[in-house]
Amino acid sequence: MSNYNSWGIHMRSGHCWHSSFPVKKKNKRSSKIPMNEKNLDLLNRIFKSGSEKEYIKSDILNERKFRKNVQDQNKIKSSPRQKTSKLDMHKKKEESVIIIEAGAHAREWISPAVGTYIAQQLADPANSDLLKYATWVVVPLLNPDGYDYSHTDDRFWRKNRRLNKGRPECPGVDLNRNFNIKWAITGSSSNQCSETYHGTKAFSEKETKAIRKLIKRIKNVELYLSLHSYGQVILHPLGYTSDEPPGVGELRSMADAFANHISNNGGRQYAVEQAGLNYQSGGGSDDYAFSRGVPYSYTVELPDKWKDGFETPPEKILGISQEIWTGLKCLLGDLVPDAKYLC
Ligand SMILES: [Zn+2]
């Protein structure tokens, strides 16, 4: 990424904050770059353009309401009684962490829309019970400058917008080919002009470095979801080979449970398959998270199967977001049995 920081929303048992991910250390005392005017301008444009415009119009994503909800959640957190009950509940077991990464590929607009919807639901005090059983980390837009470019210049842009040395006419790295897991082995390109250009080395990009840092820093990540489109399929590791990983049965049964939760609650039918079954690619975030010990790591190719492609009609945004959210709430009960009643 050349111009902007990735940003994340991190919610843990009642508190939430927007943050810029740590980037290149210029000053040893502070590894974070604050949200500056340039970034804020980009975010404002993102939330007022393209598919998100429909959110604002229909009051699904109401910024004022979102801010108020976050404040309310913070009040809950600061209540001593709440703290005690949380401690009692989890004194035997470390809290599970769920990471949701959205918007790695610029043109897949439904992905950040769903990520944003999930963040909004988590900030709603009506859903505060969900924060009792897991720490949720939402990265609603991993590739902001690519996403912006897909609104302003090229609807089907996929990569980020970094300038590639020696080829100014061919910018961009495919973020989902840049992770250090079988990097550049298969399903990516060393040609900077290619849509699947994997970068000069693994983790050459700020965005992928930020995810690496997140996964390394946070212990006990139980579930990692990478939201993409399209295909209406839940893909499990391994993606770089068609060989099955150890523990494939568990990976598959959790993915089947997710798909069933979605369809049993009135949502679409999502297929489940191994990512590398028909097409192999190295350097993906799902395989990376899995290689770092995350037991349940998936890429969700959001709807539809083929007709809409990347151009999800705005009227379908809410339905897709709701079905993923419902499936996720139920899936929490499979990860943390005490949370089954939330389904
Ligand atoms: Zn994608």
Language model features with spans:
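Extreme N-terminal flexible tails
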Residues: 1-24, 28-84
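Mature extracytoplasmic/luminal segments of secretory-pathway proteins
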Residues: 10-13, 190, 340
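Short beta-strand-to-loop junctions in surface cap/lid or active-site-entrance loops
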Residues: 85-94
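Active-site/substrate-binding loop(s) of hydrolase catalytic cores
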Residues: 94-256, 260, 264, 299-312
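Flexible, glycine/charged-enriched surface loops at secondary-structure junctions
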Residues: 129, 268-276
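Intrinsically disordered or highly flexible coil/loop and linker segments, enriched in small
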Residues: 184-185, 267-268, 337, 341
